[in-house]
């Protein structure tokens, strides 16, 4: 099919064009020029209703997360729950809001070393028990009628070690320049 376009020239956005498509264009000696897709930049611009909903949904979700965090901090160190229970507890706090429909993606609820596994998912009925003095990662989001959230936090029940503090601060320093780009 591409041979039909020999001698033609195409505009492609390197940020959204799959490598397979670019390779096919090169292989068939079809000329192309890079442009930034104008649609992508227009999606970033939000109207007043979208801006209002964005603020509102993050207030709802933030309140649910604060309640979850407060619950987490008040747990007795001898009576902690597992990763699955914690994910369900956050869902419970979000569910109080009548605009909440579901999680926006499966919650990553990871304790200790599990927090370093990319897109970790606890096994139903086999999730790790949360204990004091270790890091707990929760990456979750809510799907509300007026918007979607995505929140990642690292919590600890008890005291972090000096090593944890050093590594965590190093990560923040590394990611800070990237955050400013957004």
Language model regions located:
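Buried hydrophobic positions in well-ordered alpha/beta secondary-structure cores of metabolic enzymes
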Residues: 54, 109, 133-138, 171
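Acidic/histidine-enriched ion/cofactor-binding microenvironments in catalytic or ligand-binding pockets
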Residues: 116-146
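Internal maturation/activation junctions in enzymes
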Residues: 104-106
């Amino acid at each position: 099919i591409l041979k039909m376009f020999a001698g033609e020239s195409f505009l492609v956005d390197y940020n959204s064009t799959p490598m397979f498509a670019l390779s096919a264009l090169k292989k068939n000696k079809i000329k192309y020029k890079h442009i930034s897709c104008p649609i992508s930049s227009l999606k970033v611009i939000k109207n007043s209703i979208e801006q209002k909903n964005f603020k509102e949904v993050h207030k709802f979700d933030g309140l649910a997360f604060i309640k979850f965090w407060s619950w987490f901090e008040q747990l007795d160190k001898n009576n902690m729950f597992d990763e699955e229970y914690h994910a369900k507890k956050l869902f419970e706090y979000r569910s109080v809001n009548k605009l909440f429909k579901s999680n926006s993606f499966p919650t990553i609820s990871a304790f200790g070393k599990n927090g370093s596994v990319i897109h970790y998912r606890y096994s139903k009925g086999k999730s790790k028990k949360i204990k004091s003095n270790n890091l707990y990662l929760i990456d979750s989001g809510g799907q509300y009628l007026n918007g979607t959230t995505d929140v990642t936090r690292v919590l600890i029940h008890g005291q972090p070690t000096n090593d944890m503090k050093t590594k965590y601060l190093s990560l923040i320093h590394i990611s800070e320049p990237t955050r400013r780009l957004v």
